[in-house]
Amino acid sequence: DFSQPEGQELIRRLAIGADVLIENFKVGGLERYGLGYEAMRTLNPRLVYLSISAFGQDGPDAAKPGYDAMIQGMGGLMSLTGAPDGTPGGGPQKVGIAVADLMCGMYAVAGILAALQERERSGLGQYIDLSLLDTQVAWLANQAMNYLVTGQPPTRQGTAHPNIVP
């Protein structure tokens, strides 16, 4: 229980010998207990510290909570998922699994591995700020490319593919 002094001290002791610390709270979740990146970095300069939140650590929505289905909608994925408008069951739908959570975890692994590789060179850890929304939007690169090339916004096409299946 990191809200208690004993729990905070335990986290500090663990951080001294840790390679990576991952937090997945609203902004300031660990910081308010003296367990933020700067505090942990003083204990272990080689620590890679990853913060996952809905909207990132700064910006107008940073303090807001978020969850997978909400991020799928805000990130544009729901606008592409499901049957086309005007067809039975048409309209935006969420993906059947927590795909925004999963893809954020995949980006987290890539970021951590890159930071660990850099640490081998520099001897220093890094801070990684990763948001569910940013990683969700990044997965829409093909739709963005299609829009930039054609000027047509992407639409829901059911199981069809906008570039392969006519």
Which residue ranges define each predicted feature?
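Rossmann-fold NAD(P)-binding glycine/threonine-rich loop
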Residues: 27-81
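Structural scaffold positions in well-ordered secondary structure
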Residues: 22, 40, 49, 68, ...
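A structured beta-alpha segment of the ubiquitous adenosine-cofactor-binding alpha/beta core
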Residues: 1-42
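Acidic, glycine-rich segments within the central catalytic cores of soluble metabolic enzymes
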Residues: 74-166
